[in-house]
Amino acid sequence: SAASDVYKRQMFVVGNQAAVDTWGDYCYDLTGTPIAGELTTDAYNLYDADGKLCSIGYCYECYGIIVNEDLLEKAGYTLGDITNFETLKAVAEDIHARASELGFDAFTSSSMSDDSSWRFTGHLANLEYYYESVDDPDAWKECPSSIKGTYMQNYKNLWDLYINNSAVNPADLAAGGFDAADEFGKEQAVFYQNGSWEWAKLTGTGDGQYGLDNLSMIPFYCGVAGEENAGLNCGTENCWAVNALSLIHIS
């Protein structure tokens, strides 16, 4: 490893625009390189103000609402029945109303303890930021000092759907002590907000894993016009950069 001096420190992680602003002068321009040619999207690359390709995303994560399709079908629905907030709401409320009959509920718990709340104060809140950036891209070239709040009602609508269609009383969520991953893994709920990093735990068959094998993920449907065409939330701060000065020394 580089830490043990087995090889020279030539590759680094420059993972966001602030890092590019700080270290961009040291980054080799990766434009036209073989690794750049392998990419199928430019969405996760980082450029400096002059258009130099400073770093390239080498992996990314997605998050949204994970769906147990087997349970969904037991409730009488398929993934194709859910295309927007209106249809998600109808399905979730029906499942919740029949939870005793079905043996499972719509959503896992939405605990506000520190080990869970980041899913909602961070990831779910991103729907507000994203749609504001779509409306006004120039205002979001850098992080703005404030938001307009245009889509906060959409955020609230989805949050309310979570907490009102779960086996856990909303009044108890602030106290914490709930394990949404375990609830989902034990097939106690159809829907679970989380991300691709949960895949191994949910589908694996080792200790502490659940062996589920029919999972999908849907976007944060929240009632925004055109959301039928929305995709998952994807991003990364895992971006490789090459130290241009090290290449000078090599040559």
Where does each model-flagged region fall?
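Short, small-residue-biased leader/transition segments that mark boundaries at the very start
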Residues: A2-Y7, I250
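Extracytoplasmic/periplasmic substrate-recognition and gating elements
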Residues: E73-A75, G206-S251
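Hinge/lid segment of periplasmic solute-binding proteins
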Residues: V13-V67, R119, A125, N214-P219
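Extracytoplasmic/periplasmic solute-binding protein
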Residues: C54-Y58, Y63, K89-C143, A189
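Alpha-to-beta junction loops
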Residues: D5-F12, K186-N194
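Glycine-centered hinge/linker elements that transmit conformational signals in sensory
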Residues: A92-E93, P137-A174, F220
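Short helix-initiation/N-cap motifs at beta->coil->alpha
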Residues: S1-S4, F85-T87, D172-G185
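A ligand-binding cleft/hinge motif common to bilobed small-molecule-binding domains
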Residues: A18-T22, S196-G211
